[in-house]
């Protein structure tokens, strides 16, 4: 059985007012080619199909057209989709009666039975080969409060749900695949990336121990960097098909191919080249004169759909009312698309001066800020655990 793992498409994303439709179409065409070329049996999409809970009509057309075309071209292909935190779980599930006829299964809502217990069977999807069940998929969507068994905290509740699901199928003697849209302990996010910082103070980090060692592969979504989790080869984030922010400019794009056979589980990454990249100049914020020199080094040419998006970081050491005009003039004739000018003010530190923008300040977690203030106020003393736990609960309740 051959499986492809992808996630975090964010269809409909607007990148600093630039429409990314052509970039997403480029990825979906490539994905269809990989499915044909490698004769894929199962496609796993681990959440955040859309960039918003209320996607545009065009984004939905793109999504459903892809599902129709790829299942028509590959009649035996089975597709499993889970909702992410950016998706509307109910909206994603709504077309299930139609999608099931195309061999597409969507899981967004965690159902409960008449007794109030979680309907575990709804989250267990059989995988077929030539009409016979040859594996099981634990299709767990993004979990909100109340979506998991009662436990002391979010992490324990999520772990308990995966344990219950695995216990339902482990005696059947068939390979088990798990899916999830979450932040796993030991995973890495892109530096200064606001798009991924949805977990406050580690409160919703899930231990990789939630995924039993006997599970053949765990397909995760939510974090945008392709990676293994805690050095476990078979617990992975596929990453996004293209950078979703400038902080992700160095992330590798692609999907993960998993081959399950009698010999075991084989894992291979299939690299994808996005239609357009993103770039930041200079590497660190510099005064205007140096910024203009860096712009002069950019390649000349016409702006096309393959032209990279450009972020310019300028250090404002003194008032410069016309800096935007000067930058825009310098960019004329350059084969780039200006997306953002980040004007940064110098901030003094013991080690010198660093630049801080408003966007960078937004990446600081409230808990980290409080811990730092406490430490400086009380002569380097760490905040007591009881106070830290109380603060964590207040932050989580406030939802900031």
Segments (PLM) and residue ranges:
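N-terminal active-site segment of His-dependent metallophosphoesterases
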Residues: 1-68, 72-76, 178, 393, ...
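Divalent metal-coordination and catalytic microenvironments
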Residues: 8, 28, 48, 63, ...
């Amino acid at each position: 059985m051959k499986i492809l793992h992808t996630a975090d498409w964010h269809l409909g994303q607007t990148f600093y007012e630039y429409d990314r439709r052509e970039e997403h179409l480029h990825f979906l065409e490539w994905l269809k080619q990989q499915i044909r070329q490698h004769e894929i049996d199962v496609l796993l999409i681990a959440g955040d199909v859309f960039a918003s809970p209320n996607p545009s009509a065009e984004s939905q057309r793109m999504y459903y057209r892809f599902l129709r075309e790829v299942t028509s071209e590959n009649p035996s292909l089975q597709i499993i989709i889970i909702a992410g935190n950016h998706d509307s779980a109910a909206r994603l599930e709504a077309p299930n009666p139609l999608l099931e006829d195309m061999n597409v299964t969507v899981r967004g809502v965690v159902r409960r039975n008449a007794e109030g217990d979680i309907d575990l069977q709804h989250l267990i999807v059989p995988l077929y080969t030539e009409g016979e069940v040859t594996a099981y998929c634990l299709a767990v969507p993004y979990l909100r409060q109340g979506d998991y068994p009662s436990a002391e905290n979010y992490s324990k509740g999520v772990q308990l749900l995966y344990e219950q699901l695995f216990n339902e199928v482990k005696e059947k003697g068939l390979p088990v695949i798990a899916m999830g849209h979450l932040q796993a302990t030991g995973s890495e996010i892109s530096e200064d990336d606001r798009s991924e910082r949805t977990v406050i103070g580690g409160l919703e980090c899930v231990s990789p121990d939630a995924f039993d060692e006997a599970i053949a592969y765990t397909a995760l979504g939510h974090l945008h960097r392709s990676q293994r989790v805690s050095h476990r080869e078979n617990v992975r984030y596929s990453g996004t098909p293209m950078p979703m922010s400038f902080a992700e400019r160095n992330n590798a794009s692609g999907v993960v191919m998993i081959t399950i056979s009698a010999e075991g589980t084989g894992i291979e990454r299939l690299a994808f080249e996005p239609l357009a990249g993103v770039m930041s100049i200079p590497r660190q914020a510099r005064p205007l004169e140096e910024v203009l020199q860096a712009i002069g080094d950019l390649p000349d040419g016409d702006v096309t759909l393959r032209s990279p998006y450009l972020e310019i970081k300028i250090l404002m050491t003194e008032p410069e009312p016309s800096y935007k005009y000067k930058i825009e003039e310098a960019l004329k004739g350059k084969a780039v698309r200006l997306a953002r000018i980040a004007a940064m003010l110098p901030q003094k530190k013991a080690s010198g001066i660093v630049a801080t923008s408003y966007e960078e300040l937004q990446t600081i977690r409230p808990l980290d800020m409080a811990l730092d203030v406490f430490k400086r106020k009380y002569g380097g003393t760490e905040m007591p655990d009881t106070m830290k736990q109380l603060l964590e609960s207040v932050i989580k309740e406030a939802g900031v």
